[in-house]
A protein has these predicted regions:
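Aromatic- and Gly/Pro-enriched, solvent-exposed loop/edge beta-strand patches characteristic
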Residues: 176-253
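Extracellular beta-sheet/turn segments enriched in Thr/Pro/Gly and aliphatic residues
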Residues: 88-113
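Beta-sheet-rich sandwich/jelly-roll-like modules and their strand-loop junctions
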Residues: 104-185, 233-287
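A short, solvent-exposed loop/turn motif at the edges and junctions
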Residues: 71-84
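Structural motif
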Residues: 21-36
Length: 287
């Protein structure tokens, strides 16, 4: 038997070495004044940022040398992204208000009776590769929040999405909260978020196996010929061991024609890897 290849992707790990400053603030909805729970905050083009907590508060560490003119993006599905600078974010106890995103009312979609169940993605489990999300951070200001992992999926027939599933082989966490993400792919990179609802779900303590998220209520329709990327964004977690925790699973490698996209924070650069995770969309496609 061939030995399993451990891919050194380091999807969710970081360190505080040489970092001397925390950026803090709070995110509220401009219309209601309520907290925007789990809004993302990221430094444009850099692996720096975090997510807000349930009360809209955020905090994350940055190098003392970070320029005050670097761009910051605060965003959440359902709201218009707010763009500012690191210099503005350095002001203490600042509140940032997000404006609601104008929603275009589309036609009511009635599912065609001639539909059949299908899978877009990889339903098999196992492979020569092993992906892992490792958190060795001792400080909530510099943890794995805001990081994303997606699988690229070509849509061969128009369809409605019933559910999203991915397989977990190891889980050392007491709880993990994720956001389901779905992007339009252009020239190999995510270009547009396709969801108008903020869809979140949780993994319970040491939960492994197939994780399933029911999406049938959201009426998500994909078009024939479209390429999308579906996956997860890490919002919040609690470790069983405060010093170390790992979330991991298997993947097919090498996988010709398949790609996984990863970025370490919400505004970091995307990285592409030639492996195929056990992650898929269950759909009802047109015959």
């Amino acid at each position: 038997m061939l030995p399993r290849l451990v891919l050194a992707v380091c999807l969710f790990s970081c360190t505080l070495t040489g970092w001397a400053q925390q950026l803090t603030g709070r995110v509220l909805a401009a219309s209601s004044g309520r907290p925007v729970a789990f809004a993302t905050v990221g430094i444009k083009g850099k692996a720096l940022g975090s997510t807000a907590d349930e009360r809209g508060h955020f905090a994350f560490a940055v190098p003392a040398t970070l320029s005050g003119t670097d761009s910051v993006v605060i965003s959440c599905i359902g709201f218009r992204a707010l763009r500012l600078t690191v210099g503005q974010l350095r002001a203490p106890e600042t509140v940032w208000r997000l404006q609601p995103q104008a929603q275009t009312l589309g036609d009511v979609q009635v599912r065609h009776p001639k539909l059949k169940p299908a899978i877009i993605g990889r339903k098999a489990v196992g492979g020569l590769a092993y992906w892992s999300a490792r958190d060795t951070s001792l400080n909530v200001a510099s943890d794995e929040r805001g990081r994303e992992m997606l699988t690229v999926l070509p849509v061969r027939r128009s369809c409605y999405v019933d559910s999203f599933r991915f397989h977990v082989e190891r889980n050392d966490f007491k709880l993990i909260r994720f956001r389901f993400t779905l992007y339009q792919i252009t020239s190999g990179r995510p270009t547009r978020e396709l969801l108008t609802d903020d869809i979140q779900f949780t993994l319970l303590s040491q939960q492994t196996g197939w994780v399933s998220l029911d999406l049938s209520a959201y009426n998500i329709r994909l078009r024939k010929g479209q390429t999308v990327a579906a996956g997860i964004q890490w919002l919040q977690s609690e470790k069983l061991d405060p010093k170390n925790a790992v979330l991991g699973g298997t993947a097919a490698f090498p996988s010709v024609g398949h790609r996984v996209l990863v970025r370490s924070k919400s505004e970091a650069q995307w990285r592409s890897y030639p492996f195929n995770m056990s992650m898929y969309l269950a759909v009802q496609e047109f015959k």
